[in-house]
Design a protein with these regions (language model features):
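N-terminal Rossmann-like dinucleotide-binding module
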Residues: 1-44
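C-terminal helix-rich "cap/oligomerization" subdomain common to oxidoreductases
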Residues: 5, 24, 63-66, 101, ...
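Beta-loop-alpha module in the N-terminal Rossmann-like domain of NAD(P)-dependent dehydrogenases
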Residues: 15, 44-106, 118
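Active-site loop of classical SDR/Rossmann-like NAD(P)-dependent oxidoreductases
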Residues: 32, 284-298, 313
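Hydrophobic residues in well-ordered beta-strands that form the structural core
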Residues: 50, 89, 114-116, 150, ...
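Predominantly a Rossmann-like dinucleotide-binding segment in NAD(P)-dependent oxidoreductases
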Residues: 120-213
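Contiguous beta-strand/loop segments that form the cofactor/metal-binding neighborhood of enzyme cores
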Residues: 182-265, 297-309
Length: 331
C-alpha cells in the first residue's frame, strides 16, 4: 500500500523511518516548499510533489501522514477525509473544537481510520498504568480505585519558531501538555472540568536556529483536571526544562504506579498487599529502550492494511482531548 507524507520538515525523517519498517508500504512525500520536498525525496529516493491538491487526488494513495504545523492540520485532514484517505496526523488534531467535530463526523461517515500521534499510549510502561487504572475493566483493579494522579512533561523547546508563537498554535499546551492530557483521558475517561493554576510565559526571548527571537506563547502551564469519575488530576507541562523530563504518578487505594519513558527515572508498581501478578512491596518496571513512534506507525499501518477499526488512539479519543483543551482555554 502507498502512504503519502505531507510535510517535509524536521519531523519527516522519523515518519519516513517509521513507515520504512513496513515491508508492504511505499512512501511518497509532499511539501508546498519545493526545495524541501525535493531534498527529502532525493535523500530517501522517494517520489515527491509540491502540489497538495494533486497529491491528495492520487488514487494510488491509501492513506496520508500529516506532519505539518498545527495551524494547517484542520484543512489538510479534512481534505484527506473528503478524498477518502485514511490519515495519521501529528498532535494535536487541530486548533478549534468545531473543526475536530467536523473531522470526526467525516471519518465516521466514510468509515475511515483517523489516528492522531499521541505516542505515549504505545509505551509499555504506560500500558501498565492503563491496565492498573481499570477504566476498561473496573472490577479488575489489583490496587483498587485511583485516588490521585499527577503528570509532568518538560523540555527546552527552541526547535522551531512557530512552536513558540500563539498565531501558529504553539506553546506548552499544544506541544507538551496534550500528550499527558491524552494519557490521563486514556487512564481515567473524559474531563469534566478544568482549573488553570498557572499559565505563564517565562522566556519571551528565545535563541532558535542561531537567531534571537521574541515569542508570545505560554511556556509553563499547570492545571487541575476533574475527570468524569471525580478523580482530580494535576498536569504540569513546560518548554523551559533544559533536559527533557517526564513522568506519571498515580496513587491507588492499595498502592502506587510510577512510570516514565526515561530509563533513568524510576518506574514501578508498589502494592501494600499481594494482588494478581504484583507481590507486596515494589515491583520495578523495566522495558529498555523502545522506539514508540515505530510502534505507533506499525499499529496505524496494520489497521489500514486490514481495514480494521482502531481500538487505541481513536478519533473519538482525540475529540475528547480537544474538548478538554477547549475547557482549558476558556479559563
Amino acid at each position: 500500500m502507498k502512504i503519502g507524507l505531507i510535510g517535509c520538515g524536521k519531523q519527516a525523517w522519523k515518519h519516513i523511518a517509521g513507515l520504512g519498517n513496513e515491508e508492504d508500504v511505499e512512501t511518497a512525500v509532499c511539501d508546498i516548499n519545493t526545495d524541501r520536498a525535493r531534498a527529502i525525496g532525493e535523500k530517501f529516493d522517494l517520489p515527491w510533489s509540491d502540489d497538495v491538491d494533486a497529491f491528495l487526488a492520487d488514487d494510488t494513495l491509501t492513506a496520508v501522514n500529516i506532519a505539518t504545523p498545527t495551524l494547517t492540520h484542520a484543512d489538510l485532514v479534512m481534505r484527506a477525509v473528503e478524498a477518502g484517505k485514511h490519515f495519521f496526523c501529528e498532535k494535536p488534531l487541530c486548533r478549534h473544537i468545531d473543526d475536530s467535530r467536523r473531522i470526526r463526523d467525516g471519518v465516521v461517515e466514510k468509515s475511515l481510520i483517523g489516528m492522531v500521534g499521541y505516542v505515549y499510549r504505545y509505551s509499555p510502561v504506560f500500558e501498565v498504568g492503563h491496565a492498573l487504572s481499570g477504566l476498561d475493566v473496573p472490577n479488575a483493579r489489583p490496587l483498587g480505585a485511583p485516588v490521585a494522579a499527577s503528570f509532568r512533561i518538560g523540555g527546552r523547546g527552541d526547535h522551531e519558531v512557530w512552536k513558540h508563537r500563539q498565531e501558529s498554535s504553539g506553546g506548552a499546551i499544544s506541544e507538551m501538555m496534550v500528550h499527558m492530557l491524552d494519557l490521563a483521558i486514556w487512564y481515567f475517561g473524559p474531563v469534566r472540568s478544568v482549573q488553570v493554576v498557572s499559565c505563564e510565559l517565562l522566556r519571551p526571548l528565545r535563541h532558535i536556529a542561531g537567531v534571537d527571537v521574541r515569542v508570545d506563547a505560554e511556556d509553563f502551564v499547570l492545571a487541575r483536571f476533574e475527570m468524569a469519575g471525580g478523580l482530580q488530576v494535576l498536569i504540569q507541562a513546560d518548554l523551559v526544562t533544559p533536559a527533557f523530563s517526564q513522568f506519571v504518578e498515580v496513587q491507588f487505594e492499595r498502592g502506587s504506579f510510577m512510570g516514565s519513558i526515561q530509563n533513568d527515572y524510576p518506574s514501578y508498581v508498589f502494592s501494600t498487599e499481594a494482588a494478581d501478578m504484583y507481590p507486596e512491596g515494589k515491583t520495578p518496571l523495566r522495558f529498555g529502550t523502545i522506539n514508540l513512534f515505530e510502534r505507533q506507525m506499525a499499529a496505524f499501518c496494520e489497521h489500514v492494511r486490514n481495514d480494521k477499526p482502531l481500538e487505541r488512539n481513536t478519533i473519538d479519543d482525540s475529540l475528547r482531548v480537544m474538548e478538554a483543551l477547549e475547557m482549558l482555554r476558556q479559563q
